[in-house]
């Protein structure tokens, strides 16, 4: 009896800590991306969002620090104010809290490299606080990333509420992005912006590249959850959010999210080929997502084709009739999979004897809704062949045939200094910087968020592309290579891959774990052509931390204590 009471007290003592982290995660997935600075005006309704974009990066940076700081202080206060009995019970789990996984060690190594890089930097203040006109990615922000990671990985517990509210908040952000894409400004955030910024800012996220990054880290969550939702209203929520997210991606003016989404869908299509029910739901969601692009045609017609600048891919997906081909294919696959799964389920419910019509004699068998492994292997080989063909074409037209006119595809298939809105220039010069660095700087970099100083010798050359300076390489991995060196980049790659791999290994039966893994994959892919910043990267850190949290809870040694593994 006493043992039972102790266990109940222990669980009660843990519940406030988990409740704090639940609120923290919800705030980071709803309040944080929705937040825009509000100013007071002299006329009704006395509140204005017109200045929201002028300091959006600093505002969200400050909000993240504040939310994380409040969560840390709350956890400390909960521990300090525990009564002696609860504190004694909580010590039982102290060893588990202090246990380090391979992901934990990589995260600590990443922070340690950032600290060493800051100490060795010639620009210590910038390395610590971050470049004010850059991305605020200094040691201070990295420290708060570490704190957020530790909070989530130690105290997070899965809740169905979290992906639901995330979907609701993201749907609002997506809808605003779609409206802003056609110069419809319901929040009046573009009133005081110059034309250039009106074209490149959107929704409550800011720059279109940041919007693409946000879609990359959120949309995969809803696509995966739409395959898991048991109730129709919940599934409708995730499918609606997915469709709005796809439309927002087409209106964002940036291709990085399309790249990440394509890789994610390819991987999960192959993975779900082993489960016909999941594959059917995935194809249904994909069909509706693709069909939703037709709504943009109606919006375009209603606004007289008055929209922001679109990329070649986005223009084709919205205005070209070829989009009907994948829509029809996905719809046909959905219908075929529906018929197959229904037929298999009916076969599983068969009479005990051929001559019996009594329902009481029905034998309930688990329907076989899996394809042979050979089918999955064949799909994987086909995907690899497609990827190899694309990469082969990229290498061929970049290194061998550099003269053939590729038209609009040249921006995609021919790498040179002009490639990817002159990202090629940033990358080529960045590798020259790394090559010419001494051993210490190769290992630890120039200091966090000091890319501006490292790249300054090339500013004169950069003017031919219309820029006078830059604070980022427009490739997260190259950026880390220059700022925190090879050691920092290696630690970062180990951390994000470790979180995803461990979640897949130990918690893959949980659909929310699968959703967070999808977010990590999609973000990691789009990061090849995008940048880390305090607007969307904190959300990625939270979702990657959830991967590790669920892996910790579902490891074999803890399988008797978890309540949600495999659900």
Go through the PLM ranges and name each one:
Residues 2-38, 63-78, 107-119, 139-155, ...:
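Alpha-helical transmembrane segments of multi-pass inner-membrane proteins
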Residues 39-83:
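Hydrophobic alpha-helical membrane-insertion signals
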Residues 42-46, 123-125, 179-189, 302-304, ...:
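Helix-to-loop transition at the C-terminal end of transmembrane segments
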Residues 43-58, 126-128, 191-204, 304-317, ...:
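Juxtamembrane membrane-water interface segments that cap and precede transmembrane helices
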Residues 51-63, 97-100, 133-134, 315-323:
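Interfacial loop-to-helix junctions that mark the boundaries of transmembrane helices
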Residues 75-97, 117-128:
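Transmembrane alpha-helix boundary signature
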Residues 129-137:
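Non-cytosolic membrane-interface motifs at loop->transmembrane helix junctions
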Residues 207, 417, 421-469, 484-488:
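TM-adjacent membrane-interface loops and short helices in multi-pass inner/ER membrane proteins
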């Amino acid at each position: 009896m006493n043992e039972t009471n102790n266990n109940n007290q222990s669980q009660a003592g843990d519940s406030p800590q988990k409740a704090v982290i639940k609120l923290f995660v919800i705030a980071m997935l709803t309040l944080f991306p929705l937040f825009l600075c509000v100013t007071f005006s002299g006329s009704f309704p006395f509140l204005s969002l017109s200045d929201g974009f002028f300091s959006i990066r600093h505002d969200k940076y400050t909000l993240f620090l504040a939310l994380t700081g409040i969560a840390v202080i709350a956890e400390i206060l909960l521990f300090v104010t525990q009564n002696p009995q609860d504190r004694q019970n909580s010590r039982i789990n102290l060893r588990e809290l202090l246990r380090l996984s391979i992901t934990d060690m990589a995260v600590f190594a990443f922070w340690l490299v950032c600290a060493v890089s800051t100490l060795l930097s010639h620009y210590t203040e910038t390395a610590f606080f971050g470049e004010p006109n850059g991305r605020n990615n200094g040691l201070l922000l990295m420290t708060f990333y570490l704190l957020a990671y530790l909070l989530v990985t130690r105290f997070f517990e899965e809740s169905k509420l979290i992906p639901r509210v995330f979907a609701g908040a993201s749907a609002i952000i997506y809808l605003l992005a779609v409206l802003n894409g056609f110069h419809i400004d319901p929040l009046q955030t573009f009133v005081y912006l110059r034309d250039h910024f009106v074209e490149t800012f959107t929704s409550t996220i800011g720059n279109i590249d940041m919007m693409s990054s946000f879609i990359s880290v959120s949309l995969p969550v809803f696509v995966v959850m739409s395959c898991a939702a048991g109730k129709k209203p919940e599934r409708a929520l995730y499918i609606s959010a997915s469709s709005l997210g796809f439309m927002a991606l087409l209106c964002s003016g940036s291709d990085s999210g399309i790249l990440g989404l394509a890789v994610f869908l390819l991987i999960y299509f192959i993975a779900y080929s082993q489960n016909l029910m999941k594959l059917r739901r995935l194809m249904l969601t994909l069909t509706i997502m693709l069909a939703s692009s037709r709504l943009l045609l109606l919006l375009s017609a209603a606004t007289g084709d008055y929209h922001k600048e679109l990329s070649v891919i986005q223009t084709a997906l919205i205005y070209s009739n070829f989009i009907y081909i994948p829509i029809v294919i996905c719809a046909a696959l959905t219908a075929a999979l529906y018929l197959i799964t229904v037929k298999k389920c009916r076969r599983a419910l068969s009479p005990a004897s051929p001559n019996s019509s009594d329902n009481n004699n029905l034998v309930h068998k688990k329907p076989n809704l899996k394809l042979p492994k050979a089918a999955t292997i064949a799909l994987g080989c086909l995907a690899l062949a497609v990827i190899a063909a694309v990469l082969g074409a990229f290498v061929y037209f970049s290194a061998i045939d550099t003269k053939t006119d590729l038209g609009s595809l040249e921006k995609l298939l021919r790498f040179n200094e002009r490639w990817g809105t002159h990202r090629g220039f940033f990358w080529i010069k960045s590798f020259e910087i790394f090559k010419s660095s001494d051993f210490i700087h190769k290992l630890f970099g120039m200091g966090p968020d000091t890319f501006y100083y490292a790249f300054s010798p090339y500013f004169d050359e950069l003017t031919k592309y219309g820029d006078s300076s830059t604070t980022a390489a427009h490739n997260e991995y190259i950026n880390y290579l220059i700022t925190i060196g090879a050691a920092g980049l290696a630690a970062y790659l180990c951390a994000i891959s470790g979180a995803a791999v461990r979640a897949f290994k130990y918690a893959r039966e949980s659909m929310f774990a699968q959703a967070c893994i999808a977010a990590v994959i999609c973000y990691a892919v789009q990061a090849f052509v995008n940048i880390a910043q305090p607007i969307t990267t904190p959300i990625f850190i939270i979702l990657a931390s959830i991967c590790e949290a669920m892996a910790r809870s579902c490891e074999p040694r803890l399988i008797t204590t978890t309540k949600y593994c495999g659900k």
